[in-house]
Each structure stands twice: as structure tokens, then as C-alpha cells.
């Protein structure tokens, strides 16, 4: 994967350039270590961050150190390690600090925090307030034998993993129709009241990193009584 490179927004009297390359969706632009911590970035693949730099002509770069600090942890409690890259894997949320060392002094920078969530939502459920409605794989055979009186309310739930919930979307698809022909609507629940029309319900669960799990119900129809 081709990485994205970003020169930092900080300056250093001993460093000519301090570069960060990462396979993130957006470049990681460096800030001062005193800048507020941010965690509004979400990635759905493991992220490898690479550090490089060039010292000013009157000195030399002796080493590059880094540390990945989990969200909520004081960076002073984590020790620096020497190296030029580090991979953040699934289930982690945190920020990088990078230190460039020369005989004339060191320069320390911080990168924006981000979350790595490579897993699609799990424990997904389509709950109905009437019995006989099942949560199924989208590849399951469609059946339409379930009869429901008056109306049925569906609520959607899932475990969204490290990144958390972005949204749930749904669509009702009539018997004999392709699901791809119908548009998604965003909601956490929906009530179906249309009479004597055989349909199935599709629901997709989306986390903040963009991972998606899609399920459907067995087919059903609503009668007056």
C-alpha cells in the first residue's frame, strides 16, 4: 500500500525536515507535543507509520525514537523506543510521539490520534416485538410464511468493536425483488404496518471505521387481524 506523507507543522532549529509516512486515509500531520489530543480518525486496516528526517547541515541525526501512547494514558508513563516504523493493529486507539535526536539537541513532535478497527460488527440482531422473526445470513433462502397481526416493530443492535457505532440502515424488499434495487434508510428501529404484502427486512450495521455487517429476516406479511 502506498503511504501518504506529510511534513510536520512544527519547526526545529536542528532539523531540516521531519517526515511521517503512513497508510492512513489522510496524512498524519505533526503538531507540537503540547497540542490537544485528538482521536477523530478511524482506520479499518492495520496502520504502519514510518519516521524519517534530515538534520541541518551543521549537525547530524543520531537517532529517531517513537512511542505509541494509548488513549487516556499519560505519555510520560510510556518510554521511547528507537526505530523508524511501527504498526498499529486491530483494537488499538492512541497517538504517536516521535523524537529526533542530534548532538545539539532533540526535537519532539506528536501525531493525531487514531483508532484501528479491522473487524466488522458482531453479535448483530434484528429484534422484533412479535415472535417468529429470525436474524439470517443474506445468503439464506427466502421464505414468506410468517403472518403478523396489525404491525411489527424492529430494533437493531450489535457490538461495534473498538471504533464504535456509526449507524444502522434498513430496507424492506418485496418478495421476488432484488435487494440491490432498493435504497437504504438510516434508523435504529422501524415499524412495519403495510397490509398483505410479503417482504423481508435487510439491516446493515456500520462502525466508525467503515466496516459493515449485513443481515436479513425471514419473509413475513402483515394482516388486519
Which residues does each PLM region occupy?
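Low-complexity, disordered linker/stalk regions enriched in Pro/Thr/Ser/Gly
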Residues: 1-225
Amino acid at each position: 500500500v502506498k503511504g501518504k506523507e506529510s511534513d510536520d507543522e512544527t519547526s526545529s532549529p536542528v532539523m531540516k525536515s521531519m517526515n511521517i509516512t503512513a497508510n492512513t486515509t489522510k496524512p498524519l500531520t505533526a503538531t507540537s507535543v503540547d497540542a490537544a489530543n485528538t482521536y477523530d480518525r478511524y482506520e479499518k486496516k492495520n496502520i504502519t507509520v514510518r519516521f524519517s528526517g534530515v538534520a541541518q547541515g551543521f549537525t547530524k541525526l543520531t537517532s529517531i525514537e517513537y512511542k505509541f501512547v494509548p488513549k487516556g494514558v499519560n505519555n510520560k508513563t510510556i518510554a521511547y523506543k528507537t526505530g523508524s516504523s511501527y504498526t498499529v493493529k486491530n483494537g488499538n486507539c492512541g497517538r504517536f510521539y516521535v523524537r529526533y535526536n542530534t548532538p545539539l539537541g532533540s526535537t519532539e513532535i506528536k501525531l493525531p490520534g487514531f483508532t484501528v478497527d479491522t473487524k466488522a460488527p458482531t453479535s448483530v440482531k434484528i429484534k422484533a416485538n412479535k415472535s417468529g422473526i429470525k436474524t439470517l445470513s443474506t445468503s439464506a433462502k427466502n421464505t414468506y410464511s410468517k403472518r403478523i397481526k396489525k404491525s411489527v416493530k424492529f430494533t437493531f443492535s450489535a457490538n461495534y468493536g473498538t471504533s464504535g457505532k456509526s449507524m444502522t440502515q434498513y430496507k424492506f424488499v418485496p418478495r421476488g425483488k432484488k435487494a440491490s434495487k432498493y435504497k437504504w434508510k438510516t434508523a435504529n428501529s422501524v415499524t412495519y404496518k403495510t397490509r398483505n404484502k410479503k417482504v423481508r427486512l435487510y439491516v446493515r450495521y456500520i462502525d466508525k471505521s467503515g466496516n459493515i455487517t449485513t443481515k436479513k429476516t425471514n419473509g413475513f406479511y402483515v394482516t388486519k387481524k
